[in-house]
């Protein structure tokens, strides 16, 4: 099977090409924070030769508690993302939570993301598809790798073929996620070898059964990222923070920002090795 390619400016997403990074922060806090984090990502990725799309959310609409920080909102958040693009000259990705937001988000974001918890919402899929933007489809935690094909088909039937598919872990009993490495190949085969992204930081989430926020296992981010890269990915999805313990959302899963360069150096070495080898197809 020939790997499908999705083009975003100078970035080519394909499972047999050098990986791209969808990297950034979980949620926008303010403009200075966004520029500081995005600037660091840009410097590191330029040194390592890794294509970058900066990720940040303007609204975390699915927080566990009504009191949790959600972000600056659609209008202010998109202004911050536009400032990041204009100042640093890098593409951006953000997630969309309602059909009404899709068109506005796609005017700023180069990639718009379908959240895992909302991935079966047909009205949202249709609205996102109709923007014509590149779409990153998060596989829901509650679906098998094969079932993501149904979401892909919805987008295609709505006229959008500019699709990335993203693994972010699967429910394992209550309050825990695991990543099934066999599922990567299943997703590729089921979806005609669309570019596959691995969301390594959200896959590290775990919950306190009585808590109102997600916990995480960021100490294992290197292990999980290396394992994922070994199967041949089009991209890695990563969230980092200058001080994860003070992050407004998902700090327990976030990579410390000062560890970004050594982390990506090791991840890139594995990707380079994997992509330098001939593909072995076993039926």
From Swiss-Prot:
It catalyses: D-arabinose 5-phosphate + phosphoenolpyruvate + H2O = 3-deoxy-alpha-D-manno-2-octulosonate-8-phosphate + phosphate. Its EC number is 2.5.1.55. GO terms for cellular component: cytoplasm. It is an enzyme of class 2 (transferase). One of its GO terms (biological process) is keto-3-deoxy-D-manno-octulosonic acid biosynthetic process. Transmembrane segments: none annotated. InterPro entries: Aldolase_TIM, DAHP1/KDSA, KDO8P_synthase. GO terms for molecular function: 3-deoxy-8-phosphooctulonate synthase activity. It comes from the Bacteria. Disulfide bonds: none annotated. Pathway: Carbohydrate biosynthesis; 3-deoxy-D-manno-octulosonate biosynthesis; 3-deoxy-D-manno-octulosonate from D-ribulose 5-phosphate: step 2/3; Bacterial outer membrane biogenesis; lipopolysaccharide biosynthesis. It is found in: Cytoplasm. Keywords: Cytoplasm, Lipopolysaccharide biosynthesis, Transferase. It holds the Pfam family DAHP_synth_1. Belongs to the KdsA family. This is 2-dehydro-3-deoxyphosphooctonate aldolase. It comes from Parasynechococcus marenigrum (strain WH8102). The gene is kdsA.
């Amino acid at each position: 099977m020939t790997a499908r390619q999705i083009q975003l400016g100078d970035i080519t997403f394909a499972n047999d090409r050098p990986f791209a990074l969808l990297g950034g922060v979980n949620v926008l806090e303010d403009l200075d924070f966004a520029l500081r984090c995005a600037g660091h990502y840009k410097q590191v990725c330029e040194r390592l030769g890794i294509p970058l799309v900066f990720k940040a959310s303007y609204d975390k609409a699915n927080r566990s508690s009504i009191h949790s920080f959600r972000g600056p909102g659609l209008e202010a958040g998109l202004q911050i993302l536009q400032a990041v693009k204009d100042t640093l000259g890098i593409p951006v990705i953000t997630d969309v939570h309602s059909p009404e937001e899709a068109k506005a988000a796609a005017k700023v974001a180069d990639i718009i993301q379908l959240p895992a918890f909302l991935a079966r919402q047909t009205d949202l899929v249709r609205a996102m598809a109709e923007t014509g933007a590149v779409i990153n489809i998060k596989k829901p935690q509650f679906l098998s790798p094969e079932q993501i094909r149904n979401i892909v088909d919805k987008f295609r039937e709505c006229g959008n073929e500019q699709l990335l598919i993203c693994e972010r872990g699967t429910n394992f009993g209550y309050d825990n996620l695991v990543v099934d490495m066999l599922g990567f190949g299943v997703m590729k085969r089921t979806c005609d070898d669309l570019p596959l992204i691995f969301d390594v930081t959200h896959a590290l989430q775990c919950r306190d059964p009585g808590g109102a926020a997600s916990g995480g296992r960021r100490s294992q981010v290197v292990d999980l990222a290396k394992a994922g890269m070994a199967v041949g990915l089009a991209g890695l999805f990563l969230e980092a923070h200058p001080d994860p313990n003070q992050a407004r959302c998902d700090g327990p899963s976030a990579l410390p920002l000062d560890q970004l360069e050594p982390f990506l150096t090791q991840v890139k070495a594995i990707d380079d090795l994997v992509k330098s080898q001939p593909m072995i197809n076993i039926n």
